[in-house]
């Protein structure tokens, strides 16, 4: 049995800004050259399975019982926005490029929970469960993911991997799909090895520039 959370929704002001930008632009356009920066809000596409990292107020009916994380094919779902945050206080100054090898937190914008994994089996593939955990962006050390990429910084046009700091698994999708109440959404889980199932690319979003606030300093995708 899946469960629906009744917690307070986080980030309504930010969501409104994102939706306004989307309406004004008529949708997403091809990503321009640049780097992913700390504080940016974006969607992440699994490049092999063509689904975006997603979460919502629905809990797993097994395993940890925490908020579920899935992959969706739709590009315009507001529940697919994640904020890039530092692994520690002051560890990711706003607007600075994210370094390859840097540990970050990915915070789900609408619920304020962090991308998380732990030693529970995932519901469909029996890999490692990936969930969303915490309140208002505050969780624990199992929310940390290392950005694995080539070169010095995370480039918006490049494919990257996210390796969990605590358990070493890679954020992955292998194609399993759920039934009701989230029919058609793909399972997201952790896998022990780097492969084609765990490459991701930055897509739609707002990318913070050094010294800029969210309302004025963005590059729209």
UniProtKB/Swiss-Prot annotation:
The modification Phosphoserine is found at residue 215. One of its GO terms (biological process) is chaperone cofactor-dependent protein refolding. A motif (Prevents secretion from ER) lies at residues 218-221. SMART domains: MIR. GO terms for cellular component: endoplasmic reticulum; endoplasmic reticulum chaperone complex; endoplasmic reticulum lumen; membrane; protein folding chaperone complex. Keywords: Endoplasmic reticulum, Phosphoprotein, Repeat, Signal. Induction: By tunicamycin and a calcium ionophore, A23187. Residues 33-87, 95-150, 151-205 form the MIR domain. Ubiquitously expressed with high expression in the testis, ovary, uterus, and low expression in heart and skeletal muscle. It is found in: Endoplasmic reticulum lumen. It comes from the Eukaryota. InterPro entries: MIR_dom_sf, MIR_motif. GO terms for molecular function: ATPase binding; misfolded protein binding; protein-folding chaperone binding. Its main location: endoplasmic reticulum. It holds the Pfam family MIR. Residues 1-28 form the signal peptide. This is Stromal cell-derived factor 2-like protein 1. It comes from Mus musculus.
């Amino acid at each position: 049995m899946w469960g629906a959370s009744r917690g307070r929704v986080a980030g309504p002001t930010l969501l409104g800004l994102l939706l306004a930008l989307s309406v004004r632009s008529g949708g997403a356009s091809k990503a321009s050259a640049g780097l992913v920066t700390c504080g940016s809000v974006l969607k992440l596409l699994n490049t092999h399975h063509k689904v975006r990292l997603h979460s919502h107020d629905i809990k797993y009916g097994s395993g940890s019982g925490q908020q579920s994380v899935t992959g969706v094919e739709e590009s315009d779902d507001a529940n697919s926005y994640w904020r890039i945050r530092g692994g520690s206080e002051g560890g990711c100054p706003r607007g600075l490029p994210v370094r390859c090898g840097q540990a970050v937190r990915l915070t789900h914008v609408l619920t304020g929970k962090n991308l998380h994994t732990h030693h529970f089996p995932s519901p469909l593939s029996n890999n490692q469960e990936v969930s969303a955990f915490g309140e208002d962006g505050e969780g624990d050390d199992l929310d940390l993911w290392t950005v694995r990429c080539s070169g010095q910084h995370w480039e918006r046009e490049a494919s990257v991997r996210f390796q969990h700091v605590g358990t070493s698994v890679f954020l992955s999708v292998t194609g399993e799909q759920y039934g009701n109440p989230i029919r058609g959404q793909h399972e997201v889980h952790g896998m022990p090895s780097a492969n084609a199932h765990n490459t991701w690319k930055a897509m739609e979003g707002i990318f913070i520039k050094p010294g800029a606030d969210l309302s004025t300093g963005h590059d729209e995708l």
